[in-house]
């Protein structure tokens, strides 16, 4: 059995997080995603008692394209995932991967001191979490 120190999520998370309002239409959100090169957007909380949401390409594919809805007529809040599971930046990468598997998710905001400091995904876990790839 090989024991390896995979390191913390902090080492592979993306720190340039783009947040949008849930009232934004999906077409505008997709334009933002394309412009910043993001595969997900964090949907802002409406107040301190609210939770974060996330918009993924899979939400758009399943809830807009597959249902033949016009993206300019659908609001982000209608199709986003909410509430979302969050992870800590000091969480071990292998536990983050297990969390994703156990809950069927592929992205999660990274939260420290009640603020989003990054985003982590399977893509980032694999390509930036494996030390032998550097």
Regions found by a protein language model. Name each.
Residues 1-134:
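Tandem CBS (Cystathionine beta-synthase) repeat/Bateman regulatory domains
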């Amino acid at each position: 059995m090989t024991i390896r120190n995979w390191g913390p999520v902090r080492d592979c998370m993306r720190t340039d997080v783009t947040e949008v309002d849930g009232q934004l239409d999906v077409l505008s959100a997709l334009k933002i995603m394309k412009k910043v090169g993001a595969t997900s957007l964090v949907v802002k909380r409406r107040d301190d008692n609210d939770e974060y949401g996330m918009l993924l390409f899979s939400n758009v594919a399943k809830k807009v394209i597959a249902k033949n809805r016009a993206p300019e007529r659908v609001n982000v809040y209608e199709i986003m995932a909410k509430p979302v599971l969050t992870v800590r930046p000091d969480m071990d990468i292998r536990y983050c991967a297990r969390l994703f598997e156990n809950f069927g998710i592929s992205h999660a905001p990274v939260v420290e001191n009640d603020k989003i400091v990054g985003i982590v995904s399977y893509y980032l876990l694999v390509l930036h979490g494996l030390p032998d790839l550097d």
